[in-house]
A protein has these predicted regions:
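A glycine- and Lys/Arg-enriched "phosphate-lid" helix/loop adjacent to the NTP-binding pocket
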Residues: 1-41
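A structural signal for short, well-ordered beta-strand segments and their strand-loop junctions
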Residues: 3-5, 51-53, 200
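Histidine (H) residue identity feature
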Residues: 5, 46-48, 207
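Generic detection of intrinsically disordered/low-complexity segments and helix-coil linkers/edges
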Residues: 11, 37, 52, 104-105, ...
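A generic structural signal for ordered alpha-helices
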Residues: 17, 21, 39-47, 138, ...
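Short, exposed beta-strand "edge-strand" segments with a Pro/Gly-rich flavor and a Y/T-containing core
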Residues: 20-27, 54, 144-152
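NTP-dependent small-molecule kinase module
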Residues: 22-24, 31-86
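Phosphate-end processing signature that detects enzymes handling 5′-triphosphorylated RNA
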Residues: 59-60, 66-238
Length: 238
């Protein structure tokens, strides 16, 4: 599943915001913008959140929504376009105090798979409340991968753990999901690093400009560097 949030006209298209055509709408522009921020915050932490802003025209907004949905559902297969960055170890207090950020604990296990495929299962959640996923990935390019994902019951998850690839260790990480400037960052903090972390962002267009908050210090982009992929970090060294 995924969440596609269309930003209110009260943020970026104020001239089109009106209460005249909707008797249920009573908020001022400022109130509507504040409620929109709260709604985005409520969905922050979802594994697939997309925020559709008012940068251009309403028609462009609808085209972007359709592109995001097509990217998620896939034509003919679902795929992800993802950019990945090595960053300095983030300010955890800033992240955890930020209302636009949600902390998630993840345990990721790689399963035995066919050549050219990557199969993993995840436990994802916080405070004892977890959901489970199986994901199959096939590489298309450095930035683009076919991704097929399905929800699992706890029983299915535990059964699939029996198929774990014994050449790889489990990956445990804390993920901070952060919305900023209508972008959705996933910042992964690993227990074996004290000086760096990984920031990822998914998009529907490979040429989308990315704007980082000033609190996030980018060391370099590592999208095409396989050594920073979770599958490589999980590899047990001889």
């Amino acid at each position: 599943d995924a969440v596609f949030h269309l930003v209110t006209a009260a943020k970026g298209a104020e001239e089109f915001y009106t209460t005249a055509n909707n008797s249920a709408r009573t908020e001022t522009v400022e109130e509507a913008a504040a409620l929109d921020d709260k709604l985005i915050s409520a969905w922050t932490g979802h594994p697939h959140l997309r925020v559709i802003d008012n940068t251009l025209t309403f028609e462009d907004k609808m085209k972007k929504l359709i592109a995001e949905i097509a990217s998620f559902l896939g034509e003919p297969e679902p795929y992800e376009i993802e950019r990945k960055y090595l960053i300095e170890y983030p300010d955890i207090r800033w992240l955890e105090s930020n209302p636009a950020c949600q902390r998630i604990e993840i345990i990721q296990t790689y399963l035995n798979s066919a050549a050219g495929e990557e199969v993993r299962v995840r436990q994802r959640g916080i405070d004892g409340n977890y959901i489970y996923y199986q994901t199959i990935k096939r590489k298309v390019s450095d930035m683009k991968r076919v991704e097929i994902e399905r929800r699992l019951s706890q029983a299915e998850y535990l059964k699939l753990l029996m198929l774990a690839d014994t050449t790889k260790r489990q990956i445990r990480k804390t993920r901070y999901c952060l919305t900023y400037e209508n972008q959705y960052f996933e910042i992964d903090v690993y227990p074996f690093w004290s000086d760096k972390a990984i920031a990822e962002i998914e998009m529907s267009d490979e040429h989308t400009e990315i704007v980082f908050p000033k609190q996030i210090k980018v060391i370099k982009e590592v999208t095409d560097d396989d050594s920073f992929r979770n599958a490589s970090l999980a590899q047990i060294k001889e």
